[in-house]
From Swiss-Prot:
This is 6,7-dimethyl-8-ribityllumazine synthase. The gene is ribH. PANTHER family: 6,7-DIMETHYL-8-RIBITYLLUMAZINE SYNTHASE, 6,7-DIMETHYL-8-RIBITYLLUMAZINE SYNTHASE DMRL SYNTHASE LUMAZINE SYNTHASE. Keywords: Riboflavin biosynthesis, Transferase. (2S)-2-hydroxy-3-oxobutyl phosphate binds at S85, T86, R127. The active site is at H88 (proton donor).
Length: 153
């Protein structure tokens, strides 16, 4: 029996990070967490590219562009969609999550979903590093593991 597990050593990996500008104060905290995660695991700052997009809905297009490039081993998408009083939230969350998943399946590269989908601002703040960890950091570690696992298989 063979067992494969992605290593958490990131030296030599090149990564793309996409951050939504909408709810930027949350996106910035998620970005800080992701950068910390990549640096702690050995990614050189020069091997990290950050692309800012208007909001979560625009992420799948840029994720596809990055993932199709041989330059990147992994891509992470970071941002926050916070529920309001209309159904807009449901449409955005659904399309963004499907779009990001499709990019990963189409390109064969890990594209991590670090878009917080919360009922209120307090939940978003908690998941951006104040109480419940930092989803950006978690996505960075997940991207490292998946990129290495793909190389191993």
């Amino acid at each position: 029996m063979n067992i494969f597990e992605g290593k958490l050593i990131a030296e030599g990996l090149k990564v793309g990070i996409i951050v939504g500008r909408f709810n930027e104060f949350i996106g910035s905290k998620l970005l800080d967490g992701a950068l910390d995660g990549f640096k702690r695991h050995g990614v050189n700052v020069e091997d990290i590219d950050v692309a800012w997009v208007p909001g979560a809905f625009e992420m799948p297009l840029i994720a596809k562009k990055m993932a199709k490039s041989p330059k990147y081993d992994a891509v992470i998408c970071l941002g926050a969609v916070i529920k309001g009083s209309t159904s807009h939230y449901d449409y955005v969350c659904s399309e963004v999550s499907k779009g990001i998943a499709n990019v990963s399946l189409e390109t064969g590269k890990p594209v991590m979903f670090g878009v917080l989908t919360t009922n209120n601002i307090e939940q978003a703040i908690e998941r951006a590093g104040t109480k419940a960890g930092n989803k950006g950091y978690e996505c960075a570690v997940g991207a490292i593991e998946m990129a290495n696992l793909i190389k191993e298989l």
